[in-house]
Amino acid sequence: MIPPLKTGVTLPQPNWPGIETERLILRQWRASDVAPNTMMLSDPGTARYITADGKPITEPMNGWRNSAIMAGHWVLKGIGMFVVEEKATGKFTGRVGPFFPPSWPGFEVGWGIAKEFRGKGYAFEAARASINWSFATFELDKIIHCIDRENAPSQAVARRLGATIEGETVLLGHAADIWVTHRDRWAG
């Protein structure tokens, strides 16, 4: 169950324009996102930390299924990971945002940026916007980030966000540290 909404807040509707940052647009999923999401997940280095089995997604049907899970999270929960679009080009750069499926250890803001867009600070920029939105929208004291112990780039993003390791979990058979961003320490 998602946390209670703050008083007077409503969840995004299908025509919601999204969140804009200096360089990015965070928005809901479209059919046109399936191919670039599949391309992102075909990279072994990306798939290792994002796909359920840690293997690259190379079959179009599996890419569609993964995108349907992301889009379906919005339908079933009213929230979900945003598609991250580069404002200057309109290109799909990844997915970042709230993720809270059944049996998850808490309300997460996660991130995954396509290989060709890494090193530009997009994960941090989009995650910061997602955390700001989540704290503004929900009655939350903390937001978690489940990060594989070998995923140094994601750990660096979490540190930059001010998150700290406060536990561990096993998700889909993979050990992960639970990084936590606390509302009362969040600088936004």
Regions found by a protein language model. Give the residues of each.
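A short helix-loop-beta-strand connector motif used in the catalytic cores of GNAT acetyltransferases and
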Residues: 68-83
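Conserved GNAT-fold acetyl-CoA-binding loop/helix
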Residues: 45-69
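Acyl-donor (CoA/ACP) binding surface of acyl/acetyltransferases
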Residues: 1-49, 79-188
